[in-house]
């Protein structure tokens, strides 16, 4: 039977790699601690701090405690450091040159490999699919599940193919390809799918350009994005610290070459795009699907016939502060941000530097460049890119997520407009009231110079899209300024936080069988909500993510809609502030694609804490849908007609009953069955309040059997310290000795 790339990885693997950061992990480690469980595979787990940390200079850095001023951010970072020590995990802290954004450090270390399954409590884990890996974001409950069992309960997605044929024109980059695709399919176009990107335009791209495309696949609604590995992939990985070596390398490459879709493989959805149709592209609204070529005008909602789409456009334009039919090149900006897990790698910085060299940013613009890792920063400085940027008036920063989302000091002020290389332009994403326009690094650089959204093709140094792998080792061999000091630091390195311990998988304590309240029936007045693409930033803004607990977030639910930003007073018109709906346990949303955006489990936690345990909509984003079940909540998908019927009764304040046992929704004068919408296992767990980690741990013998098969078949997937394999933290070479690779 012919299989796709996704089919092959799905059939062969469980969970091979787990990346951990400070925002979505505290509650997971607390769950392990409370259940007396250990991390099953420390050798397959890598942790770092990235979301909360400042990107200011670290020349005087001593510790997280003294460096991070904001209390909640500091607590999350300190908690991660405590947890990695207690659970014996590899950790790249702020004093480590290898620290950076999780989706940058994984590939540059060779932790990400073709054919692996990669997970992280971050929706942009899809980045790693550029290597032919199946990589997807997970919620905190699933983070805990992977830590405890190195497995996940998953339903297979559909296969979707996006084929881009032809040659990209000058000035068009992989970011433009990604935005163009999202504009075509919409933010829900890839829902329940894994997208395989292929075609001559994709095959010509460098690994870093491919990562940008796969990174954005989540914004098209997909569970993951994948690109088949090839010689460009192998050359990128060769010699990376955690890539296989010698005979194992040869065996790995032989396997990796088989990771491509068979000629007659079937796809559920097939999209074909001509590369010549793609122009430098930006967003104009508050959703990644709100895109247009830079040469276009702001769209006019009056030209749209669909009422829901028209309303969404009007809302977006009101927030973003644009007038229909205005040329996009006449839109003035206040800030420019080059960074994020989408566009902070060395090729991105080279592309932007080629535009700004010898020029200066507009007088009214603040512009910043934030490298994706300490190693990228060092490489850029060796190439003199930092000087190019600072001479042009840019701020040169340390590695971190920075202004991609306003969880750290790098934020927009209300009303400020930013040309950004990040991945989301949701309301308030970069700061409360901030206005975000997504674009490529070259486009952001051009906007910073001119002070307006700008067609990069008008600049003399128009960069071509990268088409070849970067020079060998360029981002993994940082120069050692002080060899003696470095050797001393390596000798004194904490063996717990710098390398995983030798030994077999460890689990302590009996499995805990029940951790959730049972869900059988809910009855009451449902709250109606008529908004499309309700995203996770709308459900719970980023400033409320700085918690190490699962509780106390009910007051933050729909914060921007419920409260006046100036006074903090309730907005009486918002549905959950109205007396009839203050105690609603059911929410009925008439718009599609509910819960799109981040993998943050804080969204269902906020609903649960408010008291809402059932959400009814026409469609849900995949990660939010899964996260609901992990928290004893029931998301129900119905037709538009059925949802509209329930919304009508909700508006009339009539009671609705959701009966999960019999899988029916009852309302005055009728009922709606939802038999086919809930899988039997999920129903069983909800009705009985079962903890699926405990259920999985009952399959320990099956997990051990798979691990033995993996060690035999794909030995390079075991960590360097697994079951007594030799491991040593090595120093980086000096001028008098050949440089050694960074190791764990």
UniProtKB/Swiss-Prot annotation:
PROSITE patterns: ACONITASE_1 (PS00450), ACONITASE_2 (PS01244). Pathway: Amino-acid biosynthesis; L-leucine biosynthesis; L-leucine from 3-methyl-2-oxobutanoate: step 2/4. Coiled coil: none annotated. Keywords: 4Fe-4S, Amino-acid biosynthesis, Branched-chain amino acid biosynthesis, Iron, Iron-sulfur, Leucine biosynthesis, Lyase, Metal-binding. One of its GO terms (biological process) is L-leucine biosynthetic process. [4Fe-4S] cluster binds at residues 341, 401, 404. SUPFAM superfamilies: Aconitase iron-sulfur domain, LeuD/IlvD-like. It catalyses: (2R,3S)-3-isopropylmalate = (2S)-2-isopropylmalate. One of its GO terms (molecular function) is 3-isopropylmalate dehydratase activity. Binds 1 [4Fe-4S] cluster per subunit. InterPro entries: 3-IsopropMal_deHydase_lsu, 3-IsopropMal_deHydase_ssu, 3-IsopropMal_deHydtase_ssu/lsu, Acnase/IPM_dHydase_lsu_aba_1/3, Acoase/IPM_deHydtase_lsu_aba, Aconitase/3IPM_dehydase_swvl, Aconitase_4Fe-4S_BS, Aconitase_4Fe-4S_dom. The keyword Iron-sulfur applies. Its EC number is 4.2.1.33. Its cofactor is [4Fe-4S] cluster. GO terms for cellular component: 3-isopropylmalate dehydratase complex. The keyword Lipid biosynthesis does not apply. Belongs to the aconitase/IPM isomerase family. Catalyzes the isomerization between 2-isopropylmalate and 3-isopropylmalate, via the formation of 2-isopropylmaleate. Monomer. NCBIfam families: leuC, leuD, PRK01641.1, PRK05478.1, PRK12466.1. This is 3-isopropylmalate dehydratase.
